[in-house]
Amino acid sequence: FEFLLQGPENVEFSDHFKKLCKNPIVVHRIPKLRPNIKLALKEWDKFFRNNAHRYDILWSNQNGLTHLEFLKLAKKYGIKKRIVHGHCATADKFYRFIHPLNRLFVGKYATDFWACGVEAANHFYHGKERKNALVINNAIEVEQFLYNEEVREKLRKEYDISEDCLVVGQVSRLYEKAKNQSFCVKVFSELIKKELNSRLVFIGKGDTTFLKNLAKEYGVEDKVIFTGLKSNVGEMLNILDVFFFPSNFEGLPIVLVEAQANGLPVVTANHLPVARILENYDNSLSLKDEFSIWADKILSVRNSRILDREKVYRKITESGYEIKSSTRELERLFNE
C-alpha cells in the first residue's frame, strides 16, 4: 500500500498500524483541488503519469463524489482495477449538486463500486453501479474493545470521576458540521438537571474553543471533559456508561461498532445509517426532538451495558465486523 493525500496536513498513523506494515509507510502529497484548480490538475496528472505503472489498484476512499479526477487519471494511465469506496450516506449543501452529477459518470471511470453500508451504497451509486455495489463492513479488532472493569476503575481515577457518576460521551474528531457536538452539550445541560452526578466526555482531537464556550454558556463547563486524541480508544470506552452519537451525517460509523464491542448502550439519531448489533442500541429519536427527551432516553439506558464479553464477541463476529475474516474477504476482492 501507498497513500496519496491532498494538501499539506499531517496524517497520524498509529503505532499499531505501523507495526502491521511490512514496509515503511509511503505517503505521496499532491495539492488540493482548490483554490488553484489548474495548478492542482497539472500536478495530479504529473503524479499519475510518472507513477501509475507501479500500481495494480487504485482504491479511492471518499465521503462524496466531489470529483472523479483520480479515477479519470488512473484509467488514462493504465491502472486496471479502480475502486470507489463510499463512506458517507449524505452530502452537505455544496456537494448536493455536484455529487448526484458525478454519480452519472462514475461508472465510466471506476471498475468496482464499494460502500461501508447499504445507505452509503444507495447514496453513491445508481442504476447498474448500485446493482453491482458491494458492502464492505468497517471491521475492528474486537478484543481491543471488550469491556474491562480494571481499566474502567483506573481511568475513572485518572480523570477524577467517581464510580457512581453517569458518564456520557463519544469518540470522534471535534467537527461540528458533521458530528453535531453542540447538540451533545445542549442535551447534557438537560441531563444534568435530572442527574447532577454526571459528566460529558469527548474523546478525540480538534479545536475545543467553540464547545468550551458553549458549555460555559449552558453552565456545564465544569462537567465537560476533553481528553484530546487517544491511541487507546478501546480502553477509553470503558470510562463511559452511554455512547451518545447524534451526528448530522455519517456513512456507517465505525465508532458505533467499537462502542457496541465494549458492550455500551448506544443512543444515536434515527436519520443515520443503522449499525445495530446489540439489543441496547437505540436510534428512536430525531434531532428535532426536545433536548429533555434525549436526556430521558440516556437515563433510561444508563444501566444496560452488556458485560458478557463472550456474547459481545460472538455478536460482533456474526455481524461481519471482525477484522480477521474481513481481511480475508478484502484480499480476495483485491485479487479478483
Where is each model-derived feature located?
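Short hydrophobic beta-strand element within catalytic cores of glycosyltransferases
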Residues: 4-5, 265-269
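Aromatic "clamp/platform" in nucleotide-sugar-dependent glycosyltransferases that forms part
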Residues: 229, 248
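A charged, aromatic-enriched C-terminal amphipathic alpha-helix characteristic of glycosyltransferases
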Residues: 144, 306-336
